[in-house]
Amino acid sequence: MFRGASAINLDAKGRLAIPTRYRPEILEQNQGQLVCTVDIRQPCLLLYPLSEWEMIEQKLLSLANFDPALRSLQRVMLGYATECALDGAGRILLSEPLRQRAKLEKNIMLVGQLNKFEIWSESEWNAQIEQDMVLGSSSEFALSDALKTLSL
């Protein structure tokens, strides 16, 4: 399970070092294999262990592609999906199209979301968190049906 937010740097070649606390799980359960794609709703990337991505892929493939919205989702998520392998130093290489799509430069955030990571530019992450905090204190957030049943 991937938890927490880590501020990390992309090197000049577009590589990022996965924090050491996550590496054993990625290596043991997925032989260091990950898949990165874009988030269709947010300006970030989604980084899945290969086994998690294979489940997402099956869900995407099972959708009827006659629906233009579903076809767009498939096109974007599958079209950008790129396999990334941990190298000997625990780094992965993010392709140029992925980096451009998420506006990634040197300072980035790797954010654990239990079964996957989100990869954000640091500035986009800070803006999103600020927006989420404002929403969290609003009455709209409290009125969500799904949140009414959530016990933390």
From Swiss-Prot:
Domain SpoVT-AbrB: start-end pairs: 5-52, 81-124
Gene3D superfamilies the record matches: Transcriptional regulator MraZ domain
A molecular-function term among this protein's GO annotations: DNA-binding transcription factor activity
InterPro entries recorded: MraZ, MraZ_C, MraZ_dom, MraZ_N, MraZ_sf, SpoVT-AbrB_dom, SpoVT-AbrB_sf
Cytoplasm is among the record's keywords: yes
A GO CC annotation given for this chain: nucleoid
Keywords for the protein's UniProt record, in alphabetical order: Cytoplasm, DNA-binding, Repeat, Transcription, Transcription regulation
Protein's cellular compartments: Cytoplasm, Nucleoid
Entries under Pfam families matching the protein: MraZ (PF02381)
Superkingdom per UniProt: Bacteria
One biological process term in Gene Ontology: negative regulation of DNA-templated transcription initiation
Subunit annotation: Forms oligomers.
Cited PANTHER family: TRANSCRIPTIONAL REGULATOR MRAZ
Protein family according to the UniProt entry: Belongs to the MraZ family.
Entry protein name: Transcriptional regulator MraZ
Organism, scientific name: Actinobacillus succinogenes (strain ATCC 55618 / DSM 22257 / CCUG 43843 / 130Z)
Lineage: Bacteria, Pseudomonadati, Pseudomonadota, Gammaproteobacteria, Pasteurellales
